[in-house]
Each structure stands twice: as C-alpha cells, then as structure tokens.
C-alpha cells in the first residue's frame, strides 16, 4: 500500500496514487493532456485524480518514496528490477504485483515528502535517466505492440526529453550571459510552541541569523496553529512547530487544510534542540 504524501506546503503529492502508464495513458502524460484535463477519467488516469483523498481505495501504482509490501508478494513477483536506476522501478514492481494476483492500495495516512531533494533536476543526467526509465518500462512490458501504437509513444517520450533538455540549455545560456531570475524574498520564520520552548527558539534564530517571530501555543489552546484568526503570514515563511506541543498528525492536518504557496513546514525537536526544514537543519 501507499500513503498520502504531502509537499512541505501541505499540498497533496499527485504521485501518491497513480495509474499504470499503459500506451495511451503514457501518451496522455507525455503530451500534456493529463495536466490539461487532470480529472478526466481517461486523460487524467495517470494520477487517478477522480479518487477522493480521504478514503482508502485500490490503485495501480504505489510510490517508491514510501510504501509497505507483503513479503509473500515479493517472494512471488521478485524485488526491484536493477535495469532501472532511481526512476521507474516502483511502477515496474507495482505492475508485477498486479500481474501476480495481488492488489495495490492507497491509504490516506499523511506523511511529509521532501520530493526531489535527492536529485538535481537541472542536470543532463537527470533528464537522461528519467526518460530512459520510461523507455525501459515500455520495452519490457509493451514490446509486443504494433508499430502503429509504439512509435507515437516512443516519439512522445523522446520529444518530452528533448523539450526538457532544450529548456535547460536556454536557462544555462541566459545565466552565462548574465541574466538571472529575480532572487526570492528572504525566508522568514514563525516558531510556535509551548512557553518552555521560547528561550531555545530565540537562541536558534539568533545564532543562525534567522528573521523570526515567536508564538506561544499548543495543540490544546491554539488548535489551528498558524491558521488561527489574527495571525498574518506572508509568502516565503517557514512555520516551525514544536513536536511536543503539536503531534505530527495535527501539524499535517493544519497545513493540509489550507496549503499556501510560499508557506513551508518545519519541525522542532526538544530532545536534541534541532529545527528541520526543507531548506536546512538548524541547531
């Protein structure tokens, strides 16, 4: 089974549940039709967007970022295929699990997923490995298709890869000519926790040069956290919760109830006086 993965702004990660990239589903994904019509039962099948987020349900592909697998299923269908590297192996394994007579399920238990932090998506190697994985999957499971179907699929995959490379080359050329994107507004911090945490919060902010505000609150007396009436939060803000004052499930529920672009999630552990955010670790 797979779970409900969240981005660090509280929004749901679409790859929490996916459909098998069969010939037409893959074509819709590569051609952009899936993104254009995400809730269409056929065009948007890759992300299974017609499913509710709050209830368990059968899916076709579980994410390799976080999943639980039965030992008996792996004994029957085998482990990850080493022909893949980094991408595609979870789709391949999910397909083999289904072919082995088992089921894949989505469970709405939330986890925080720092997506893409283990890869550099602006590299040529990323583009090569990512799209090569799609071709490996296609050759492995759909090699028997007629050329009338297979050629457009391969062209869509390679076309998407070329577009990604071209876009990357343009960005690098602009940088080499001295054109840079406008720097983002500096990240500010909002620390929320019990009164006993305030001294340590202020020390961490001071020693790490963080622009910060501090709110005394717990799950009991400030249940809505940073979404409470009267708290004004602008973009590019990291809200750090003390995990002794707020459970992880409560933090996820608060962020998930109203995701805000630029408002990120952070956590503070009293046991080791450490703040963890997507952008760094502070002590």
Across the structure, where does each feature detected by a protein language model lie?
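Active-site-adjacent helix/loop segment of glycosyltransferases
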Residues: 95-171
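A solvent-exposed beta-alpha-beta segment
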Residues: 179-283
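Short, flexible, basic/aromatic active-site loop/helix in glycosyltransferases
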Residues: 3, 20-59
């Amino acid at each position: 089974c797979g779970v409900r993965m969240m981005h660090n702004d509280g929004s749901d990660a679409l790859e929490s549940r996916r459909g098998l990239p069969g010939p037409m589903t893959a074509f819709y994904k590569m051609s952009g039709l899936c993104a254009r019509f995400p809730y269409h039962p056929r065009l948007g099948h890759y992300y299974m967007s017609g499913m509710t987020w709050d209830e368990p349900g059968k899916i076709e592909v579980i994410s390799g970022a976080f999943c639980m697998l039965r030992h008996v299923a792996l004994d029957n269908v085998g482990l990850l295929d080493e022909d893949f590297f980094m991408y595609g192996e979870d789709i391949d394994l999910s397909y083999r699990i289904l072919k082995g007579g088992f089921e894949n399920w989505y469970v709405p238990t939330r986890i925080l997923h720092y997506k893409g932090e283990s890869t550099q998506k602006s590299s040529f190697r990323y583009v090569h490995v990512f799209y090569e994985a799609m071709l490996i999957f296609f050759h492995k499971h759909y090699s028997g298709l007629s050329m009338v179907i297979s050629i457009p699929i391969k062209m869509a995959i390679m076309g998407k890869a070329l577009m990604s490379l071209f876009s990357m080359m343009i960005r690098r050329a602009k940088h080499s000519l001295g054109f840079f994107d406008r720097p983002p507004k500096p990240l500010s911090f909002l620390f929320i926790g019990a009164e006993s945490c305030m001294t340590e919060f202020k020390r961490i902010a001071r020693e790490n040069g963080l622009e910060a505000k501090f709110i005394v609150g717990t799950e009991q007396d400030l249940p809505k956290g940073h979404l409470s009436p009267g708290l004004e939060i602008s973009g590019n803000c990291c809200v750090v919760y003390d995990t002794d004052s707020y459970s992880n499930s409560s933090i996820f529920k608060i962020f998930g109830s109203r995701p805000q672009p630029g408002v990120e999630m952070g956590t503070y552990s009293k046991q080791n006086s450490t703040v963890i955010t997507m952008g760094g670790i502070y002590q």
